[in-house]
Amino acid sequence: MLDFAIFAVTFLLALVGAVLYLYPASRQASGIPGLTPTEEKDGNLPDIVNSGSLHEFLVNLHERYGPVVSFWFGRRLVVSLGTTDVLKQHFNPNKTSDPFETMLKSLLGYQSGGGSAGEDHVRRKLYGDAVTASLHSNFPLLLQLSEELLDKWLSYPETQHIPLSQHMLGFALKFVTRMVLGSTFEDEQEVIRFQKIHGTVWSEIGKGFLDGSLDKNTTRKKQYQEALMQLESTLKKIIKERKGGNFRQHTFIDSLTQGKLNEQQILEDCVVFSLASCIITARLCTWTIHFLTTTGEVQKKLCKEIDQVLGEGPITSEKIEQLSYCQQVLFETVRTAKLTPVSARLQDIEGKVGPFVIPKETLVLYALGVVLQDPSTWPLPHRFDPDRFADEPVMKVFSSLGFSGTWECPELRFAYMVTAVLVSVLLKRLRLLAVDRQVFEMKYELVTSAREEAWITVSKRH
């Protein structure tokens, strides 16, 4: 039932804000333990702001009231679920809708959810297959960009501090733009231009709608709208160029145009993937390398596996998939970093979790960041320990949360492969080292990032 988990995570804040406009307010009492509204108009929004983030607010709320808690966003009741047991109990029959797609497209001004359940299923399958096909076709490009970054880092003196987050975002943008859009983005200036547009749109989705600040700031709203129009215009132009064309490189757009989608549907899916995959991939690369710099034994063990599996021959996708310990490192990175800390779904009909009744049209949060740090499920939860994922029961829990296996979303599956390739290329030649006395704090937003730039150094292995 958690097939939507990762999708919904990345734009939870947008979902929270948008739902206020899509559904009438409800003050129905639920009997679920939690907070009463701090303010009549804003509900518990001031408490969320004072906590620093929605994730940190939910951590405190679940510690205080238990696994099932409630609070108010404006005049709307919100229920949060904070353990694997209560998540398993949550039932929502509307499995054909996807909160990520529905709410993101609503905020972007798109028409969503207009097809039948069968049509929606076919469209989502086409989307996932398009990601898989274009990633396979562009694997040589992924290797090329990874090796270019390796060469750049090899050229640095060992004392050079490398801005990790900046480099990972640039790397992710280069690959995603060329995989999605094609040869247009071989030009470095086009990538830089796209990065500016992408950054403006991403920074406002969720944040501005959560606190209402976007509507209150006409300058910001205008910049956001102009950036979105530029993004759409760029994508429309390339979609038109590639439709019916004969290109050497197969892209994400090419896969979509081969399906039975109209131009608007193709545009929507390109916008969604372009926005989400860049950030999720960049953050996963950043956190993975960061944790490798702070856990020397893990890095040594991963280097050993890479040397044994990849050898001196060419790196292939088949060999990357054989890196079982690397996969454990990536899973533990997602868990420890709480990469996507909150997911959400609208309760379509009245439901029940334990003794608690969840009213219809209640916004239900999945406090994944809380669940991923639950010591009853993850012993020593703050410790970075990839070996925990060698246990089958642990993998089943992780998969049930939507982070692997059947319910793993295309964007995360994409990010896993890209990160595995980059890390493999880097570790064949480099040791990744932490900068001494660096204070490293997490910033919990739609996707968890470092509050300040993450700095590392490198030295040659061979």
UniProtKB/Swiss-Prot annotation:
Pfam families, A to Z: p450
Keyword 4Fe-4S in record: no
Tell me which domain of life the UniProt entry assigns to the organism this sequence originates from: Eukaryota
Would I find Heme among this entry's keywords? yes
Supply the EC number(s).
1.14.-.-
Going by the UniProt record, its keywords in alphabetical order are: Heme, Iron, Membrane, Metal-binding, Monooxygenase, Oxidoreductase, Transmembrane, Transmembrane helix
Q: Report the membrane topology from the UniProt record.
A: Single-pass membrane protein
GO CC list: membrane
A GO MF annotation of the entry reads:
iron ion binding
Residues that bind heme, according to the entry? 409
Report the cofactors. Answer: heme
Kindly give the InterPro entries that the UniProt entry links to this protein: CYP450_20A1-like (IPR052666), Cyt_P450 (IPR001128), Cyt_P450_E_grp-I (IPR002401), Cyt_P450_sf (IPR036396)
Please state the protein's primary subcellular location: membrane
The portions of this protein that span the membrane are 4-24
Subcellular localization, per the record? Membrane
Q: Which family does it belong to?
A: Belongs to the cytochrome P450 family.
Name of the protein described by the UniProt record:
Cytochrome P450 20A1
